[in-house]
Amino acid sequence: MSSSNLSSRKTRISAHFLDAAPAEDEIVTVEGWLTYYDEEKKSWIPLERAQVTIYVDGREVGKAETNEYGMFTFAFPAPYKGRHKLEVRFKGKAGYESSSKSLDFQVMEREQKLKLGRLARDVLLLIIALVFLLFVAIFITNMLR
């Protein structure tokens, strides 16, 4: 074992929400990766079978374990409407430093989320219609030549 392996290795957490704007009472899912820096390989390596703790607004809501790829997933019910802070913490273990990652998320009212979904659908349909009209205009222009 080299001397660099005897000291604690740096770790980092990367994380994201599957839906960063959930409605009240929906399930919020966060997934992420825990990695450590290997000085010899000069790269970040997945940290397998490590436990991370999940906090929402400073309160512990659960724990997750990383798989063989250093990936973890955790789901919990969305709290009340408003802005919230999620934190994923790795307390460290023999040979590995602790690390944490914070993410902010917004919980919406269910009706507000439905309106936003309808608006997104309408914008998509409008874009499709405009592209269709553009193709028709190009086709007609080419026919008149």
UniProtKB/Swiss-Prot annotation:
Q: In terms of one coarse class, where is the protein primarily found? A: membrane
Query: InterPro entries, from UniProt?
Result: Ig-like_fold
Is this entry keyworded Transmembrane helix?
yes
Cellular location of this protein? Membrane
Keyword match Membrane:
yes
Q: Where are the transmembrane segments?
A: 123-140
Whose protein is this, by species?
Answer: Archaeoglobus fulgidus (strain ATCC 49558 / DSM 4304 / JCM 9628 / NBRC 100126 / VC-16)
Keywords annotated in UniProt: Membrane, Signal, Transmembrane, Transmembrane helix
Q: What is this protein called?
A: Uncharacterized protein AF_0657
Renumbered to this chain, the signal peptide range is: 1-23
Q: Name one GO cellular component term.
A: membrane
Q: How does it sit in the membrane?
A: Single-pass membrane protein
